[in-house]
């Protein structure tokens, strides 16, 4: 960890994560990596509370971070840092929209390049694709001495574009990331550029860490705006489409977000819907349907073969608390299928029935 003052890159990280600063951490998700900022903070004021320090550990993306329930929740513990000059520019302001791309991310060259490329009718322009990939390679090479910061910012830019892009128009973005992984950046020593012994861009080093930082939305939040709900759907669609292209025999494949699929399906079909409002249950089921629409084969195959996850991250929902489930399996897949079939036949909302029928058809034919 460096002893240098806060860098622009660290400020970008904190601005990004700081949007939901009072609500961290969320068990089931890894902590945010504001390590440099916190180290600087510790020299300016008494140590921050443990819940904030816990956000700053470097975690492996394959590690589970679940609470005893296995479900994410929002912490209500918060503390003011306004007395610390260096933190004034990093803390969220009340008048800043909760959703959207902040100025720090919008100013990134990678964000500008990618958002320009993805602004299409949903089809991929091959020439523009190669040009964008080359630009990302060049930017990574120029950032060799600060590759960790560069990757963190770049992945935030990628997910920012995903949040703004409807599912039906995400193909260029997914194609871009797949093509990017087929390239390797050469370091100044003539060897492949690496971070944590992972190759840039083949292994997408720390991509999973950034994803987990972002997966902090709560479908039970009745105050969520329409824009926020749309961003949840878009992020879920993006992760699902990546999972559909992942090598599922390799649990470390950076495209494999199957654990997130399980969380979505669990929230929709394994909790007592009577205890949830119609609105929150509707959001949860919509996210589950998005996964079943974009990654039906992956979800089916992992359920048939069996895929357990570390710790309690894959445990069952409250309706099935007595089941010894730690991940995806055939019995659990059957529960999801039965729930969807029931919704498709009994839901009072016509749109819900239609979505459920589409999801049920995906499950029956895969």
PLM-predicted stretches and their roles:
Residues 12, 40, 58, 72:
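Cationic, low-complexity basic patches in intrinsically disordered or flexible, solvent-exposed regions
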Residues 41, 61, 65, 74-82, ...:
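N-terminal mitochondrial targeting presequences
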Residues 94-327:
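Eukaryote-skewed repeat-based solenoidal scaffolds used as protein-protein interaction platforms
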Residues 332-366:
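Eukaryotic acidic, Ser/Thr-rich intrinsically disordered low-complexity regions
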